[in-house]
Amino acid sequence: MRHSLSDLSPRQMWLLILLVIAALLAGLGLREPMPADEPRFVLAAKTMVETGQWLFPQRGIELYAEKPPTFMWLQAASYVLVRSWDVAFLLPSLLAALLTLWLTGDLARRLWGKRTADYAVLGLFVCLQFVLQAKRAQIDMVLVGMTTLSLW
């Protein structure tokens, strides 16, 4: 007997969705930024919040023009919302991962149907690098989310 994600009841599907979200949320707020990139991004975001200078990211007093500022803006905005750097520095990557999963599912559903959409989301979620980047404070996951949004 063949089973597919389409055979799941709505309750089971919601349980699966909650399980995916819980897996991505696991450990949020339990670690400090890790070298090499994460501390630099957090320092630039902290400087934005402390000085009110959001247009040109800085690390301390030095202009930080090595990377696009979007990720640091998102980290700083996350801090304004949650008031905890332990959570705020990882929140943009987590939200971008959830957005990417949703956009992938919606696009696949529109193009090929619900069954294919379910497998597309599951296939993306079980990719190790996708989950690792969703739990890192690096630009990559936000770039993936924005690229997926542009294709959607």
Q: For the regions a protein language model found, what residue spans apply to each?
A:
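Membrane-integral, polyisoprenol-dependent glycosyltransferases
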Residues: 2-152
